[in-house]
């Protein structure tokens, strides 16, 4: 099998987001940074929001039309301040990307899960998306073309362990659907992307495991951050103007075929 190619970081000549402002959480590196690159490459003004301000500033410095902002999605005041900053900086808010997440609870046995780690993962991943969406919604509605895109996971649809992370990502499915119904009359679309395994800094030191997983994917490779960025750009753009409340799998065909991911991930 010849592996498919990753989506390009930018597409020359395409400016779907000219005059748009986007706020991206967890945008200092990995998928969030790739989304920031893609949206600025298509003309957007972007707030690179992250709990790690130093990394956010470094990412924003690479981009035209981007600024960094500290944002802790587990804190309502921090979220509201980041949204207000985006509007003050650029005069409007058109796109919110809920990308921040936590994956600290990693007990192999469910009964060994820690209460604090469980609560942290759900608070950042699921409730964080709620906080950001709540704060951004009035501004997105005012833009007349608002879009919310959250980053879920195939873990939200099928058992790949990581109990708390999976529960939080599954919660994003229902949040997306219920919010889509509420936001549609206000002209705001709400969608979700479910990535498979993506080559991000979270895998540093485990590159060998990524190579073992590649053949499990029907398209012959693990994903790249740019693959997710391309999907987000589509869902946030006018090209998806009649799409809301949906989940877009960007998983190389994994869930369609389910070719023994967990067995390979466990090293069997």
Residue locations for each model-derived region?
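Alpha-helical segment proximal to the catalytic Tyr-Lys
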Residues: 138, 181-182, 241
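C-terminal substrate-recognition "lid" of short-chain dehydrogenase/reductases
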Residues: 133, 221-250, 255-256
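Short, small/polar-rich loop/turn modules that mediate ligand/substrate recognition or access, typified
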Residues: 145, 184, 189, 243-245
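A short, exposed helix-loop element centered on a Lys and neighboring polar residues
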Residues: 133-134, 177
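Short C-terminal tail/terminal secondary-structure segment
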Residues: 2-13, 107, 244-268
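Catalytic loop of short-chain dehydrogenase/reductase
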Residues: 149-171, 176-185, 197
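Substrate-binding pocket helix/loop in short-chain dehydrogenase/reductase
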Residues: 106-110, 114-119, 213
